[in-house]
Curated annotation (Swiss-Prot):
UniProt organism field: Francisella tularensis subsp. holarctica (strain LVS)
Family assignment from sequence similarity: Belongs to the MinE family.
Domain of life: Bacteria
Alphabetic keyword roster: Cell cycle, Cell division
UniProt keyword Disulfide bond, yes or no: no
NCBIfam families, alphabetized: minE, PRK00296.1
Name used for this protein in its record: Cell division topological specificity factor
Pfam entry (one): MinE
UniProt GO BP: cell division; regulation of division septum assembly
Signal sequence interval, chain numbering: none
Known role: Prevents the cell division inhibition by proteins MinC and MinD at internal division sites while permitting inhibition at polar sites. This ensures cell division at the proper site by restricting the formation of a division septum at the midpoint of the long axis of the cell.
InterPro entries linked to this entry: MinE, MinE_sf
Amino acid sequence: MLAKLFGLSKKQQSASVAKERLQIIVAHQRSELHPRSSKISSHLLAELKDEIIEVVKKYVALSEENIRDIDLKVEDSSKNSTIEVNIPFN
């Protein structure tokens, strides 16, 4: 009824709903990168760290101490998010 009042067709309504849902999904996916946002994001960062370690080990010898000291930091700005990785090695 409101759609008829404001002149919106069903197609326009569904497009609007789809756009809103997509915006929610994108915001949720972006928030998963932030370590304080949820337990899932901590898990994501842990997986990322493990994969980075495996790649670096192909090219550089890493001791257990080096691996323990690897640091991942997520920084958010108004334009983008960055992940900074510090890997000590001998």
